[in-house]
Amino acid sequence: MKLFIILGALNAMMAVGTGAFGAHGLQGKISDHYLSVWEKATTYQMYHGLALLIIGVISGTTSINVNWAGWLIFAGIIFFSGSLYILVLTQIKVLGAITPIGGVLFIIGWIMLIIATFKFAG
């Protein structure tokens, strides 16, 4: 599905931009703890952006589970990385409670990708 290739490329691009912003724009302006949180958000956004690219390439199959995996991983990026970015910029600690939702969405997305692979290979 071309949409996942686009979403993956956009997220990878944004991860590069947010990583550069963290390294150059936030350095010395926030604590080391929050800088580490920012870096974690950037890293996970990049990994899962690449996952979306892969899903986009393999989603030419008829397996609906591959598409579900893509949407779950995309939602995971929004909840996980998005909540961490906002947490760092606002330092509203309650936003940290949203982050695990993104982590769970990532995990379910990866499980759906595994299931789709077994169904396609089987």
Curated annotation (Swiss-Prot):
Name the InterPro entries for this protein.
DUF423
A Pfam family recorded for this sequence:
DUF423
Q: Does the keyword Signal apply?
A: no
* TM region(s), chain numbering: 3-23, 46-66, 69-89, 98-118
User: Does this UniProt record's set of keywords contain Signal?
Assistant: no
The places in or outside the cell where this protein is found are: Cell membrane
User: Which keywords belong to this entry?
Assistant: Cell membrane, Membrane, Transmembrane, Transmembrane helix
Q: What's an example GO cellular component term for this entry? A: plasma membrane
- Which PANTHER family is this protein grouped with? TRANSMEMBRANE PROTEIN 256
Task: Name it.
Answer: UPF0382 membrane protein SAOUHSC_00567
Organism name: Staphylococcus aureus (strain NCTC 8325 / PS 47)
Q: What is the lineage of its organism?
A: Bacteria, Bacillati, Bacillota, Bacilli, Bacillales
